[in-house]
UniProtKB/Swiss-Prot annotation:
Pathway: Purine metabolism; IMP biosynthesis via de novo pathway; 5-formamido-1-(5-phospho-D-ribosyl)imidazole-4-carboxamide from 5-amino-1-(5-phospho-D-ribosyl)imidazole-4-carboxamide (10-formyl THF route): step 1/1; Purine metabolism; IMP biosynthesis via de novo pathway; IMP from 5-formamido-1-(5-phospho-D-ribosyl)imidazole-4-carboxamide: step 1/1. It comes from Alkaliphilus oremlandii (strain OhILAs). Belongs to the PurH family. Keywords: Hydrolase, Multifunctional enzyme, Purine biosynthesis, Transferase. Its EC number is 2.1.2.3, 3.5.4.10. This is Bifunctional purine biosynthesis protein PurH. HAMAP family: PurH. GO terms for cellular component: cytosol. It comes from the Bacteria. InterPro entries: AICAR_Tfase_dup_dom_sf (IPR024051), Cytidine_deaminase-like (IPR016193), MGS-like_dom (IPR011607), MGS-like_dom_sf (IPR036914), PurH-like (IPR002695). It catalyses: (6R)-10-formyltetrahydrofolate + 5-amino-1-(5-phospho-beta-D-ribosyl)imidazole-4-carboxamide = 5-formamido-1-(5-phospho-D-ribosyl)imidazole-4-carboxamide + (6S)-5,6,7,8-tetrahydrofolate; IMP + H2O = 5-formamido-1-(5-phospho-D-ribosyl)imidazole-4-carboxamide. One of its GO terms (biological process) is 'de novo' IMP biosynthetic process. PANTHER family: BIFUNCTIONAL PURINE BIOSYNTHESIS PROTEIN ATIC (PTHR11692:SF0), BIFUNCTIONAL PURINE BIOSYNTHESIS PROTEIN PURH (PTHR11692).
Amino acid sequence: MVKRALLSVSDKEGIVQLAQNLSSFNIEILSTGGTAKLLRESGIDVRDVSEVTGFPECLDGRVKTLHPAVHGGILAIRDNANHMDTLKELEITPIDLVVINLYPFKETILKSDVTLAEAIENIDIGGPTMLRAAAKNHRDVTVIIDPKDYHRVLEEIKENGDTKLDTRYQLALKVFQHTAQYDALIADYLGKQISEEKIGANTITLTYEKVQDLRYGENPHQKAGFYKEIGANKGTLVDGVQLHGKELSFNNINDANGALELLKEFQEPTVVAVKHTNPCGVASGTNIEEAWHKAYESDPLSIFGGIVAANRAVTKTMAAAMKEIFLEVIIAPNFTEEALEVFKEKKNLRLIKIEDICNGNHHSYQIKKVQGGILLQEDDHILFEQLDVVTEKEPTEEEKEDLAFAFKIVKHVKSNGIVFVKNKQTLAIGPGQTSRIWALENAVKNTTHSLKGSVLASDAFFPFRDCVDTAFGAGVKAIIQPGGSINDGVSIKACNEHGISMVFTGFRHFKH
């Protein structure tokens, strides 16, 4: 039976109604500080915890509930005669219901002007201690951390005078999940005051919050969900607002993220089309409409069923053209009212608005799940520091611009990756081959464009001269690659024979 409850919350949502109902069930209410004040002002009979402990709140409220009279009442096992005799001897009354939520540490550290001192003052000590005590003793004690659970608990107490064991177990689990996240956020925040570096730490604790359940995963037989990091979501899908269309799927989110990662490489008006996380059309232009037209023309076949991301507002002209194609998702910093009107006819097309699409921060690290653990690495944020011309012929300024453009793209192509570019427009892309020459040959074979006068980017070095010979045969005038092969000299010689310029970056960009 629930006879005594302790209520102490930072989030006051629903607490008055909860206390009113508990009082109507003749349950004694203990409370502290602001919660007790609010309940009294609402006409509810409340007993201060300091009355129970015989010790006043002190140190500006830092010490309120850390006392055996509180924790003994929570932790005592009710059918353990020794425990109950001890409570009687010490004049401690059992506490059957604990309702706590914690100081708003997460909300505090998300403020742009937060200080370390302010963050530290919002680290709750007594709250987690009581929560964990009640959760540990959930066989006898009900614990609530989430106001959404108030109604469920009240209904069970009203019906049975107590909660069900299964309910108490679920609520206890919720507490341990929450306090684990709470401590992880504190550790992460304090760690960042010393260094942003996670890699190299002996232990890593990662915490995420659910955004939504997904209908299924990569395939219909796989369960899936979408979770977000705490903070650091500027310019990401989590930061976006869906304006139109069906709910995003697992594959939509994965592909859209790939499009965003690539789009963030560019500041000038650019459109990116992605299919199965690989770019299939990328172009920049003097304005976003030109960029869209060029990106679509890059590969009108592969864009079917793809994801499109633009770094400027989508216009009516773009919308009219996009409407004629089957697209899964369109992402942009904005959509004109006229564009939204055009898209109304496409009920399933998902439109996502991400205002900070250009300025959002890249992740500082990447995680890959492997059997038995994770791989953790820095984000691949370096393109190159300088271009080292290694051939007799030097690329023109226009070719250098195209080379840099192509290298930004190939960095986001599954390895082995090859990209052909001309006038800041992809003409052919060869992704995900086990042989570099196959990637190059597939790109040449599958394009509908002439590659004459184009430039070529490779995500890693050429092991043999066959790539240079094939590129020359396709009409390539300049090549950008990391270099670093023991056969670099052979590739350089081939370029010189064909009159092709080639630059080395010194940075490889494998993507798996």
